[in-house]
């Protein structure tokens, strides 16, 4: 159905003039598939009239709320400039993320200006390693088959296509409706979803992390 108008929630939010601009997280596994490799890059911006000192403190919490990794760095940022801070950690015996066991950690990023907290940004993190590599079994032409592996284990995708549509609400899909769809998918032993034919709402991806669904995204 072709519908016009605003289809998703619209938000207005404010940040301090000295705040977090963007961040990038990489959370994978080493060759043992047991230990986590955590990388965080944070862009801090300063829109104040004068230079300032900004500190970024990150904490990584497990499901019980225990801090398993934390670090902080401070940068002197001139007016209207952006500075990138980088963090790298190796974490032993992490709880890995798969569709069967979607273990998530909570990342908290705290921005401080001269010791005072400006903002705290939360983000969910899952440790998994994705590989596409050949196996011993060969095709009729003699070439080896190539398989998808998650955390060292071969994976068979069993999924569905999904449109951002509901018979009652049109293209406006609430979190309640998303959760109902995801619960039906899991009840039918599905582990993946293909988005037709556009990116979904941000909350959709967060719930895929929570429920344990691999996402075949489209743009």
Question: What is each stretch, according to the model?
Answer:
Residues 1-202, 207, 211-215:
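Secreted/periplasmic carbohydrate-active enzymes, especially glycoside hydrolases
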């Amino acid at each position: 159905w072709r519908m016009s108008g605003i289809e998703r929630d619209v938000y207005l939010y404010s940040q301090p003039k000295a705040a977090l601009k963007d961040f990038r997280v990489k959370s994978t596994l080493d060759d043992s598939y047991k230990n986590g490799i955590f990388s965080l890059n944070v862009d801090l911006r300063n829109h104040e009239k004068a230079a300032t000192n900004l500190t970024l403190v990150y904490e990584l919490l497990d499901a019980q709320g225990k801090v398993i990794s934390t670090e902080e760095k401070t940068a002197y940022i001139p007016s209207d400039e952006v500075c990138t801070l980088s963090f790298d950690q190796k974490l032993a015996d992490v709880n890995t993320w798969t569709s069967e066991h979607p273990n998530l950690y909570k990342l908290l990023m705290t921005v401080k200006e001269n010791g005072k907290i400006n903002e705290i940004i939360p983000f969910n993190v899952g440790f998994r390693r994705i590989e596409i590599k050949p196996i011993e079994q060969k095709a009729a032409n003699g070439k080896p088959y190539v398989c998808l592996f998650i955390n060292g284990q071969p994976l068979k995708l069993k999924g569905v296509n999904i449109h951002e549509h509901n018979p009652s609400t049109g293209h406006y899909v609430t979190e309640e409706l998303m959760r109902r769809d995801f619960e039906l998918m899991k009840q039918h032993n599905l582990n993946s979803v293909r988005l037709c034919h556009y990116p979904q709402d941000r909350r959709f991806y967060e719930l895929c992390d929570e429920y344990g669904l691999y996402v075949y995204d489209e743009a």
